[in-house]
Amino acid sequence: MIPGELFIQDGEIELNAGRKTVTISVANTGDRPIQVGSHYHFFETNPALKFDRKKARGMRLDIAAGTAVRFEPGQTRDVQLVALAGKRMVYGFRGDVMGKL
């Protein structure tokens, strides 16, 4: 074995299997790029991102952990969100929830 070596089985890994998802259209109305990480509570993202925030409450981007999506100024794109898991309690971020969802 070599330090850091990976042994990967054949097949595919399905991320977030069985969780509720929703696809929403997001527009960056600001004049700067906005990047959102994989586990950021999407409901609480930068106010320059315009989308149906009610649909995004309790959701995060449905992308691999540690990755992000970048929204360029004036750009509109569809993104898929996935429900937060665990105890479904949100603290920090912009401070809009601070507790149970």
From Swiss-Prot:
Q: How does it assemble?
A: Heterotrimer of UreA (gamma), UreB (beta) and UreC (alpha) subunits. Three heterotrimers associate to form the active enzyme.
Q: Which gene encodes it?
A: ureB
Q: Where in the cell is it found?
A: Cytoplasm
Alphabetic keyword roster: Cytoplasm, Hydrolase
- Its protein name is Urease subunit beta
Q: PANTHER family in the record, alphabetically?
A: UREASE
Q: Which GO terms describe its cellular component?
A: urease complex
What is catalyzed by this enzyme?
urea + 2 H2O + H(+) = hydrogencarbonate + 2 NH4(+)
Per the record, the pathway is: Nitrogen metabolism; urea degradation; CO(2) and NH(3) from urea (urease route): step 1/1
Predominant place of localization? cytoplasm
Record-listed E.C. numbers: 3.5.1.5
**Could you provide one GO biological process annotation from this protein's UniProt record?**
urea catabolic process
What family, per the record?
Answer: Belongs to the urease beta subunit family.
Which GO MF term does the entry hold, naming one?
A: urease activity
Principal EC category: hydrolase
* Family annotation (CDD domains): Urease_beta (cd00407)
